[in-house]
């Protein structure tokens, strides 16, 4: 009986769990507020990314992350990339949904410094936008979202990140191999979040090699089917990034 209760924990620390939701907290000082991360871990050999685009923020196709995920084969999801303040909420940067490019690759802003994409031969990949910009032709993509800035690169927190503005944050990260996670944070500066993600043991046995910031603030949203948790955005966003099991043929 005790073994059955401990089995999920044993599997977690042995690295056999393919996907799970976990919450991490910390306090910097006795009088400080408790910081929190809601994180969904998954493996790129058992799960894939899906993009769900609203089409317009004025007349959205879904209306919320929760509805978008429930109408898809997703087990977890977060809000996606940045978008403009016009009536349609035009995406800022590359958006690919089900193999169709909805918005082109953008450059010249920290908000579009990186791209996470689900490709055919390449699998799940997180790269700098400049790498794709130098290509004569973009690789095949089934799903893609552009965001920024990078929070962690080569296992270290990126230097020069904003240390003044605190707000909710959304991110995607990888250990450099097949282990990935999506997550949202409580109100933090970019510098604080980067330092937290890069700290050894911050996400248990998941060591962050690269992490990319997505749209945050009032756009931040998190949804997990397994635990029934749904943290909606405070405003209508343009697109979402979901995690779904790989389709076996």
Specify the residue positions occupied by each region the protein language model found.
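Gly/Ser/Thr/Pro-rich low-complexity, intrinsically disordered segments
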Residues: 16-249
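Repetitive helical segments and hydrophobic/amphipathic motifs
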Residues: 11-14
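Sec-dependent signal peptide recognition
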Residues: 1-9
């Amino acid at each position: 009986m005790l073994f059955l209760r401990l089995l999920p924990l044993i599997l977690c620390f042995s690295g056999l769990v393919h996907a799970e939701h976990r919450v991490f907290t910390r306090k910097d000082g006795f009088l400080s507020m408790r910081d929190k991360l809601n994180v969904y871990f998954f493996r790129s050999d058992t799960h894939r990314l899906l993009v769900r685009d609203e089409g317009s923020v004025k007349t959205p196709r879904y209306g919320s992350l929760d509805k978008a995920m429930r109408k898809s084969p997703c087990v977890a999801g977060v809000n996606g990339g940045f978008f403009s303040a016009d009536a349609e909420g035009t995406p800022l940067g590359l958006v690919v949904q089900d193999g169709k490019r909805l918005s082109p690759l953008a450059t010249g802003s920290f908000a579009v410094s990186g791209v996470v994409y689900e490709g055919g031969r390449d699998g799940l990949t997180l790269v700098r936008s400049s790498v794709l910009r130098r290509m004569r032709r973009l690789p095949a993509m089934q799903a893609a979202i552009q965001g920024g800035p990078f929070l962690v690169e080569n296992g270290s927190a990126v230097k020069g990140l904003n240390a003044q503005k605190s707000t909710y944050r959304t991110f995607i990260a990888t250990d450099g191999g097949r282990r990935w996670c999506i997550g949202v944070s409580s109100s933090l500066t970019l510098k604080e979040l980067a330092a937290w993600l890069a700290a050894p043991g911050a996400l248990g046995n998941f060591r962050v090699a690269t992490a990319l910031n997505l749209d945050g603030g009032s756009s931040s949203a998190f949804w997990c089917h397994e635990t029934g948790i749904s943290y909606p955005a405070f405003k209508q966003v343009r697109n979402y990034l979901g995690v779904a099991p790989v389709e076996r043929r």
